[in-house]
Each structure stands twice: as C-alpha cells, then as structure tokens.
C-alpha cells in the first residue's frame, strides 16, 4: 500500500484500488479504466460498491482538476443514476 499526496487515477491499470479518507468518510474505490470506477463508503449514496464516474478533485473555490485526487481537496464523482457527489476534504489517499 502506497500513501500519496496526489494520485493520477487515469494512469492506474483497471483493477487498481484506492482508499480515500475524507474528514467525514472512508471511501474504497476500484478503478475500472479511465474515469470509470466502483465506489463505496457513503451510507446513503454508496453503502455498497456502485459504479460511477470519477471527475477529479476540487479546491475550495470548486475548481475541479480532472484525472487527479489530491489531499486537502474535495473528491468529485457522479453515480450511475447521474447523482453528483462532492465529499468533504480528502485527508489521506492510499493506492492498494
């Protein structure tokens, strides 16, 4: 397991797993290729793994940096039902 400040998830091979802790939640993400993911960790939106699209991470102004998850930024993803989710700030990122 590798801890990182930033992860460029688009360069990870399909099947790669990320563990992302935010101030409020612990997310487990399986990379399916490109922006496609399977994610769990939110008790309402994704209590069990669901497919979605990872959009990147945003700064405090809401500007999204596509393709990257960054510590101190907010994780942005869209679930298959097209529900957009923005998390609290990322506190740690682990590539498993």
Predicted regions and their residues:
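Cysteine-centric segments in proteins
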Residues: 1-17, 21-22, 26-96
């Amino acid at each position: 397991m590798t801890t990182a400040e930033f992860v460029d998830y688009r360069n990870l091979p399909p099947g790669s797993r990320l563990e992302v802790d935010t101030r409020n939640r612990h997310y487990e993400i399986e990379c399916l290729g490109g922006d496609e993911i399977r994610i769990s960790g939110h008790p309402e939106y994704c209590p069990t793994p669901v497919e979605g699209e990872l959009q990147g991470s945003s700064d405090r102004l809401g500007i999204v940096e596509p393709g990257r998850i960054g510590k101190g930024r907010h994780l942005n993803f869209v679930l298959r039902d097209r529900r957009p989710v923005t998390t609290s700030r990322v506190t740690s990122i682990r590539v498993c």
